[in-house]
Amino acid sequence: MSAVSFLYSSKTPKFRGVFNGICALVLFCFFFDRSELLRNPLLRNASFVNGGSGSTSGGITQFMVIRRNARQIETNGSGNNSSLSSSSTVLCSGLHKHMGYADQCEFLKANPICSPDGFFDYLSFFYCSCRDFSILGYMMLGVWLVALFYLLGNTAADYFCCSLEKLSKLLRLPPTVAGVTLLPLGNGAPDVFASIAAFVGTDKGEVGLNSVLGGAVFVTSVVVGIVSLCVADKEVKIDKNCFIRDLSFFLFSLVSLLVILMVGRVTVRIAIAFVSIYVVYAFLVAANVILRKHAKRFKLEALTPLLPMQGSVFSPSVGEDMPMNTPLIETETEDGPPRLQSLPQWMWASNVAIYSNHFAKVSVHDEDRPPWGWIDDTAEVESSSCTKFTSLLEIPLTIPRRLTIPSVEEDTWSKTYAVASVSLAPVLLASLWSSQDDVSLQACGVAYFFSVVIGSTLGFLAYKNTEPDHPPRRFLIPWVLGGFIMSIVWFYMIANELVALLVTFGEIYGINPSILALTVLAWGNSMGDLVSNIALTMNGGDGVQIALSGCYAGPMFNTLVGLGMSMLFGAWSKSPDTYMLPEDKSLFYTLGFLVLGLVWAMVILPRNDMQPSRTLGVGLIAIYLIFVTFRLSCAMGFIPWAA
């Protein structure tokens, strides 16, 4: 906990400031490298001007024409996407030897299809701009990789989860419904949108599959294993009904995914059916709470819900006497019906709170205190020149999002930013739509015109109907929905860059991007789960139940909703044809180890009277180490039959 307190307490803002400053410097270098295109954004659509000839002095038009033609070939039919992928892979495999070319830079200029689909051309930056400074190139790409992980988590913690919390209150959703719908979406947003970006944005479905499944193996093995070791000497019991229910649904979802992977193709109906598994799970959890609420009337004993709906999630005979949280659903009183309360604020960003600037700066009252104890309720950010300087370093990473994501949070309210965000958000949407390869210059002009008109209108209305000292009290739903939608847009943009950068590292090191997704991307997106769940466990009491429930319900949500929505969007883009899933034999091994970890927990915990033990923890960690060793050995060719 000392390390967590050091990094995320309000007394140590220097670390974040220096980190943001370094990331901003790297971002400036990327923009400078892309300066020619930024000076004339219409170059990205220049292929329509030259009719596909692709002959300009700068060479950028030729780059776009080749990339566009490749995508046209891909969209001609679903049966061609695998052949195109394999042909481009064979073509780009000669990057390191660059036979017939002076160096890798000349190879990339002649074969621009090898560059990943991102806003920045990382391969050209590394091999051309950093041609004589490879160490500097490695360092800058590495820093930017960490920055993208941070931006993904920070967007979830400080923007997306806040919108979900407000939306839940405005819609008056019961805590049970919010706990199985909006809450896991907030905590699992980085995994979900990274998967969607891999399927749709960069057409690297194998990266999305390996990222989600690799993260699931990590959380259900390493995180559960460490949690078990932390409480092995304590008298802690896990609710058996809740545990069996979660693992049963998770195993069923993995079997369903296995069938889909074996078929190798997916339609819109199949993708919807896969996502519907989570809908059924959420319905059962909500129904359990309703039955529990009326247990005396129906004489039934309901299952424990995923999240603590009462002061304690344990059975009455087990657990702490003092509840950790205020009850979310109060029992009936003589004065009237039960009073509905909302979920505690800390729950909405529990798995991504380590990325939050908001939690590091804002003090909270005792009733809203997160159980991991990262915040001192009397702590305040020191107003010093050093703090102000580090705040300036954060501007390049924070200002673009604040200028385009509407926010109505009391602590961070600014009328200037509010007016700017509703004015610039339509322009950002138009820019993203215009960046597609099949959009004409005329369509781009029309999109920008309407975006400016809509943005100006919204900005004028926001200016006239808001106050400088507090957020708007009326018409909150449009504000919250705007923040929700623009957070998703930023998720997609950041996740798309993250996947493109991982593909770049795969090209540079000669490593299959699937391995990087299985390890680097999975570990990066799972750091929040690791830190928050261990902190909850060390807090004791109900925290152990919440941590273990999250270790299974979270990966299940990412698998069903993250991969399900990714396959749905992919199938929708190929409709009425079927979407061909990537042929990756290693996915079956990943599923096998994931099922092995779940079965191990399902066998050991009941035999030990539902008490986490060292046997459970050591066994799960050993399973993960064997899994990683096996996958890396396959990738390096040490196990030919499994490659």
From Swiss-Prot:
Membrane topology, record value: Multi-pass membrane protein
GO molecular function: antiporter activity; manganese ion transmembrane transporter activity; monoatomic cation transmembrane transporter activity; potassium ion transmembrane transporter activity; sodium ion transmembrane transporter activity
A GO-annotated cellular component: cytoplasmic vesicle membrane
Positions in coiled-coil regions: none
Phenotype reported upon loss of the gene: No visible phenotype.
Pfam families: Na_Ca_ex (PF01699)
Induction / repression: Up-regulated by exogenous Na(+), K(+) and Mn(2+).
Keywords: Antiport, Endosome, Ion transport, Membrane, Potassium, Potassium transport, Sodium, Sodium transport, Transmembrane, Transmembrane helix, Transport, Vacuole
Organ and tissue specificity: Expressed in roots, leaves, stems and flowers.
Main localization category: membrane
Localization per record: Vacuole membrane; Endosome membrane
A GO BP annotation: intracellular monoatomic cation homeostasis
Presence of keyword Transmembrane: yes
Transmembrane segments: 18-38, 133-153, 180-200, 212-232, 243-263, 270-290, 413-433, 443-463, 475-495, 498-518, 552-572, 586-606, 619-639
Gene3D superfamilies cross-referenced by the UniProt entry: NCX, central ion-binding region
InterPro entries: CaCA_antiporter, NaCa_Exmemb, NCX_ion-bd_dom_sf
Classification via PANTHER family: CATION_CALCIUM EXCHANGER 3, NA+/CA2+ K+ INDEPENDENT EXCHANGER
Function as written in the Swiss-Prot or TrEMBL entry: Endomembrane-localized H(+)-dependent K(+) and Na(+) transporter. May have a function associated with the pollen vacuole during tube elongation and polarized top growth.
Family membership noted in the UniProt record: Belongs to the Ca(2+):cation antiporter (CaCA) (TC 2.A.19) family. Cation/calcium exchanger (CCX) subfamily.
Protein name: Cation/calcium exchanger 3
Native source species: Arabidopsis thaliana (Mouse-ear cress)
